């Protein structure tokens, strides 16, 4: 069911003329895409909205917001207008013309900014010269559109280049930036988000690590002909994005070499110990960006384990089992092989990885250890004894 048909089922027919689908919901509808949420403008009373299952979130604002969540569909958000004339005010205050569209429940399009023209050409034009001044985070939203193969028109580029935005951005919660970044990682070409940040020199206060990457060698030139760390990160992200749509995996792939930023320049182009350095840096990095514990744990362990993962076939069985156990506990069992393959497309294969993970997760009973024998053993020898049993199971299964 498309957005238009769904909205009709939520309201009685007599109020349909007072409701408009707006913003990205209209954009996605015209592009034939399924959106995550549905945005509406409506000249409805609190009583009418309550009767339709909506609840008020901020009843003291001039344009109160009402929500309803429908399982399996998502969030429906209604901006309550006091009169129909406010629709045009809402439209002109939006970020881009392709998001400044409205549609009646009869399917009539309201296009006051020429948004359809830019929608057809997949070009991004700001609704007004003040669009980014009103909310500088819209710059990162523009970059996010680029990951979906949209193009910034010259006028939009000029508005972004018109000034330095770091002072304004410093007053905006980092969570808002992180949300845009994580959404961008879902795009068809996620590396474009970071390329645009560097191209326009915007976002240093949020991601200072990103802006250092172009000046750091990825490694010895015979192993990294791409040269710098930023180019290397973009290449890996592109490869991983071709293999999975999972944004957490893509995030880990782009920042897996975070530890190389700690290398002293006199040691370039080598980065000895960058895996362990990245483990510690990733925690600070993710905390600063207010990312989830899952992001923090996954990136930390990807930083630490990706080097060994790239040389998986040369590892001793004991190291393989320990690695598999660490990956299992960190929740990166599926992520690590993809990052390893992206990092070394010609040699990052990890044969029998799933078997190693299975064995690493086996209980002492499953590997044939009697409880009484384990309890009779000195505590300091138990872990190694269990490991040897798991190694035997791994070899036997092979």
Regions found by a protein language model. Give the residues of each.
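Catalytic cores of the polymerase beta-like nucleotidyltransferase superfamily
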Residues: 1-398
